[in-house]
Amino acid sequence: MSWDQVWIDINIATMSPKISEPYGAITDAALAVQDGKIAWVGKRSDLPEFDVFGTPIYKGKGGWITPGLIDAHTHLIFAGNRANEFELRLKGASYEEIARSGGGIISTVNACREADEAELFELGRQRLNALAKEGVTTVEIKSGYGLDIETELKILRVARELGKHHHVDVKTTFLGAHAIPPEYKNDSDAYVDLVINEMLPKVMAENLADAVDVFCENIAFNLEQTERVLTAAIDAGLDIKLHAEQLSNMGGSAMAARLGAKSVDHIEYLDEAGVKALSESGTCATLLPGAFYFLRETQHPPIDLLRKYQVPMVVASDYNPGSSPLCSSLLMLNMACTLLRLTPEEALAGMTRNAAKALGIDDHVGVIEVGMTADFCIWNISTPAELAYTYGVASCVDVVKNGNLVHQ
């Protein structure tokens, strides 16, 4: 038997629900890769005979393999920063007050409208490199900092180009309904018409999006407007997701679940009826501990209810310049545990198996199983819990992407 590569002297956190051990763990394990897929995984003692002279053999030095990390919610492509707003918040201004005074998302929109594609690409590349160094092999990138046809398309084109020129896979989400631009301040319905009738068709014509998102909140879009955008996305054949229940309980999550959303994100104010709706529809709940931390929120997502109703919990960075300027997947694992009280295993599942489900790619990534794409990381750790327990020590020693060893 011949394989493209074999890993030995390793432990594997498969994250597969088919294995009853915590983390789906296999200790004293081995893993084989062929044609970019996982060809064999199990105990090293059970490893079939193979051509040891013709097969590259890698030793994990007693560390751990996990699936490649998946950051399922980012706003990675933007220009400028909002450090001034950081100072304002520390002096007592609320996120909502800043947004209503013309700051917040709109200030980043203005910077993105002025930036060209080359500038946005380079900024995005640097941020994607930072995530990749921490073991991220797939990332979702949203638009939403254009709020006009030209800039929304520009951001999505840059996201697609990043995916073509980086080993990290990029899934794109059209978030034209992120905020109401100043020019539509007194006619938000007209802006929704623009998103549906002009922006979305152009996005589809260039194949720039895998999904559509909306910010459903009292400072952004109401339930009726949100449903209009999501329904148009469904009619166009795209997946849907939603920023919901971040600042108040508007019922957006239940509505999105009814429409078959892949995920609802933030959900600090989600109630039991909303959780039940997610459970019944198979919609994921995406937790964004970076925003919770940075905005110094006190309303916690309903973790116990999500467990009770067995809703898949996703952990993501929400990397953005206003509410989560924290470009670190590993920091999110730690915060998910320390701030939101997930277990380390739940947090890691939230950035592997469940994150893949939220992006609709769980048929080929998110767990270590035979037949899945060979996307995995090798960590210099003694237990998978270390990924959430400690922070600041680089422990990702190797990454395999599509069966190819990536030099970090």
Swiss-Prot record:
Binds 1 zinc or iron ion per subunit. It catalyses: 4-imidazolone-5-propanoate + H2O = N-formimidoyl-L-glutamate. 4-imidazolone-5-propanoate binds at residues 82, 145, 178, 246, 323. GO terms for biological process: L-histidine catabolic process to glutamate and formamide; L-histidine catabolic process to glutamate and formate. GO terms for molecular function: imidazolonepropionase activity; iron ion binding; zinc ion binding. It is found in: Cytoplasm. Catalyzes the hydrolytic cleavage of the carbon-nitrogen bond in imidazolone-5-propanoate to yield N-formimidoyl-L-glutamate. It is the third step in the universal histidine degradation pathway. This is Imidazolonepropionase. It comes from Shewanella halifaxensis (strain HAW-EB4).
